[in-house]
Amino acid sequence: MATKNEEILRKPDWLKIKLNTNENYIGLKKMMREKNLHTVCEEAKCPNIHECWGARRTATFMILGAVCTRACRFCAVKTGLPNELDLNEPERVAESVELMNLKHVVITAVARDDLRDAGSNVYAETVRKVRERNPFTTIEILPSDMGGDYEALETLMASKPDILNHNIETVRRLTPRVRARATYERTLEFLRRSKELQPDIPTKSSLMVGLGETIEEIYETMDDLRANDVDILTIGQYLQPSRKHLKVEKYYTPLEFGKLRKVAMDKGFKHCEAGPMVRSSYHADEQVNEAAKEKHRLGEEKLQQN
């Protein structure tokens, strides 16, 4: 018999979605396996994969392998000892972006604390190869904190992505429990330095709620991000990937997410997505700056001509 606590935390109706595994989705998944590529959309069990891959022509590639050197207690990505770097991965990602005809691509990576450069050189080369082959596709990067190696960050920012995304994930108090190998202050410093290196590139971060934080702590995190010149914020519901991961302490209602979005915009964020199903890359194609939107427009014109 379920306990009272389990009854309260039963997944609410607004989190139950019908997955549309259409032919486009199945075909793209087959191509990923054939090219030995990984998307965080699949690895992290994102609920929006069908909308992004189909209707919005966006996808998030996970590079530097499929095994992470960290074991964050919210994340579904495999952890352990990673394989050797695949130096052909940048070209394969670029080719796949072209074949998928993506409007916007997010390039994320597992943490590679085992590498001297944290994987930054292969990461930057992936951005360059994608841009060479797909001049009208906007590129967002979502790196780890690179172990606090700011030479690695300089390498990444020199590749000139259209958005730099680095996730705060949770509030200050919960950070040691949620992601023990990262620190709250290092995340803020990473975001601040990114903006200092490339002031014209929008910076972005994401916050999960439902891990036991208070509303006041959420507002404090918003203030901390704005104090470090973060432009874009996404806020979504934490969902427990398995019983081995942290439990959900609270399910926020769509109305509560609406209020969080309003507060974020009032605090000065240029763009905020907030909702039960929102993830870091949700509607990412809408968050680029005006110069990047011009790329989208030119790309659409080229598509129509073809």
Curated annotation (Swiss-Prot):
Keywords, alphabetical: 4Fe-4S, Cytoplasm, Iron, Iron-sulfur, Metal-binding, S-adenosyl-L-methionine, Transferase
Entry annotated with the keyword Metal-binding: yes
InterPro entries reported in the protein's UniProt record: Aldolase_TIM, Elp3/MiaA/NifB-like_rSAM, LIAS_N, Lipoyl_synth, rSAM
Compartments it resides in: Cytoplasm
Positions annotated to bind [4Fe-4S] cluster 1: C41, C46, C52, S281
Record's keyword annotation contains Iron-sulfur: yes
Binding-site residues, [4Fe-4S] cluster 2: C68, C72, C75
Top-level enzyme category: transferase
One of the record's GO molecular function terms: 4 iron, 4 sulfur cluster binding
Catalytic activity: [[Fe-S] cluster scaffold protein carrying a second [4Fe-4S](2+) cluster] + N(6)-octanoyl-L-lysyl-[protein] + 2 oxidized [2Fe-2S]-[ferredoxin] + 2 S-adenosyl-L-methionine + 4 H(+) = [[Fe-S] cluster scaffold protein] + N(6)-[(R)-dihydrolipoyl]-L-lysyl-[protein] + 4 Fe(3+) + 2 hydrogen sulfide + 2 5'-deoxyadenosine + 2 L-methionine + 2 reduced [2Fe-2S]-[ferredoxin]
Entry superkingdom: Bacteria
PROSITE patterns per the UniProt record, alphabetical: RADICAL_SAM
Region annotation Disordered: where it falls in the sequence: 283-306
Major localization listed first in the record, in broad terms: cytoplasm
Pathways per UniProt: Protein modification; protein lipoylation via endogenous pathway; protein N(6)-(lipoyl)lysine from octanoyl-[acyl-carrier-protein]
UniProt EC number: 2.8.1.8
Manner of cofactor binding, per the entry note: Binds 2 [4Fe-4S] clusters per subunit. One cluster is coordinated with 3 cysteines and an exchangeable S-adenosyl-L-methionine.
Cofactors (names): [4Fe-4S] cluster
Domain Radical SAM core: 54-270
GO cellular component entries: cytoplasm
One Pfam assignment: LIAS_N
Similarity annotation: Belongs to the radical SAM superfamily. Lipoyl synthase family.
Full protein name: Lipoyl synthase
Organism: Staphylococcus haemolyticus (strain JCSC1435)
Gene that this sequence comes from: lipA
